[in-house]
Amino acid sequence: MARDVPASTPAGDTPTLTKAELAELLFDSVGLNKREAKDMVEAFFEVIRDALENGESVKLSGFGNFQLRDKPQRPGRNPKTGEAIPIAARRVVTFHASQKLKALVENGAEPDLAR
């Protein structure tokens, strides 16, 4: 499912796919009405967000994995003063692309993730 890159994208800038554009693509390709397409995109991201909030990993076959990682406290430094300050422990979300997605991106192929 290819999409047209807007003509207004300045040279050198990477085009960005937004949630609104995802909904528009669903509208065009699947035949949902615009409201249903927008709701489906929102629901998809809500399910992923809820799973991550509950400490679960999210695995999307052929696309990649979202995982939580706990980073321990570590020493840091104020760049202006050079003063040593601790960087607090935190939890972060990481994304690891699948081998299939990596191959599609590397080969410059039009990704058809519905396969």
Swiss-Prot record:
Gene behind the chain: ihfA
Family matches, as InterPro entries: Hist_DNA-bd (IPR000119), Histone-like_DNA-bd_CS (IPR020816), IHF-like_DNA-bd_dom_sf (IPR010992), IHF_alpha (IPR005684)
Similarity comment: family membership: Belongs to the bacterial histone-like protein family.
Source domain of life: Bacteria
Organism, scientific name: Burkholderia pseudomallei (strain K96243)
Assigned GO CC terms: cytosol
Function: This protein is one of the two subunits of integration host factor, a specific DNA-binding protein that functions in genetic recombination as well as in transcriptional and translational control.
Keywords annotated in UniProt: DNA recombination, DNA-binding, Transcription, Transcription regulation, Translation regulation
Designated name of the protein: Integration host factor subunit alpha
UniProt xrefs under Gene3D superfamilies: IHF-like DNA-binding proteins (4.10.520.10)
SUPFAM superfamilies named among the record's database cross-references: IHF-like DNA-binding proteins
Entry-linked Pfam families: Bac_DNA_binding
PANTHER family: DNA-BINDING PROTEIN HU, INTEGRATION HOST FACTOR SUBUNIT ALPHA
Subunit structure: Heterodimer of an alpha and a beta chain.
Transmembrane segments: none
An annotated GO BP: DNA recombination
Entry keyword annotation includes Cell membrane: no
GO function term, MF aspect, one: structural constituent of chromatin
Signal peptide stretch: none
